[in-house]
Design a protein with these regions (language model features):
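C-terminal catalytic "cap/lid" subdomain
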Residues: 2-180
Length: 180
């Protein structure tokens, strides 16, 4: 689940399936046009990004080592250990080398997640094939919200420039290949 404040995404699924548009209005300015979420898109070039969402109280857990490179079932063990302890993963990044995996989780779950992962991979850690997991806290997860962003060059660049210009360091990055 997500902690985004605008709309709870699982409530959209039945509407998307039945092709029913959803209109989001500003309660402080109800006469404003608002935003329409639908299966059809009609966008001007400067309307690609519709907003920015965020989730506060985020920690990242980083797990790395050569012992995970090319090992079938590694990710399955990793995520099953978290899932069996009801730890929700907000974001996932993995290096293309398969040398590391990083997840964003609610900070309230951070210490439990570290214990669970270090216990699950206790043997690999003891053999120095994988390092103990590391936690970094006091973070937030931000996302730009829009449609047809993958066909518009420079969207990510503008986001990263804005963050850098405001002295905000990016700790992990994930971008889906789909438009949803």
């Amino acid at each position: 689940s997500s902690d985004l404040k605008v709309i709870y995404f699982p409530t959209l699924q039945p509407l998307i399936e039945d092709n029913i548009p959803v209109f989001i209005k500003n309660t402080f300015d109800p006469s404003a046009e608002g935003t329409c979420i639908s299966n059809s898109t009609k966008l001007d070039n400067d309307e690609i990004v519709k907003g920015i969402s965020h989730i506060e109280n985020i920690s990242i857990l980083n797990f790395e080592g050569s012992g995970m490179v090319g090992v079938p079932g590694f990710s399955k063990r990793f995520f099953e250990a978290l899932s069996s302890n009801q730890i929700n993963v907000v974001m996932i990044t993995q290096a293309s080398s398969e040398f590391s995996i990083c997840i964003a989780i609610n900070s309230n779950d951070a210490q439990l997640a570290k214990q669970v992962i270090d216990k699950e991979f206790e043997f690999e850690i003891s053999q120095k094939r994988i390092n103990e997991s590391q936690i970094e806290s006091n973070l937030a997860n931000i996302a730009i919200v829009g449609d047809k962003m993958k066909s518009k060059k420079g969207i990510s660049g503008k986001l990263f420039s804005s963050l850098g210009n405001n002295n905000i360091n990016v700790r992990a990055i994930a971008q889906g290949a789909s438009e949803r």
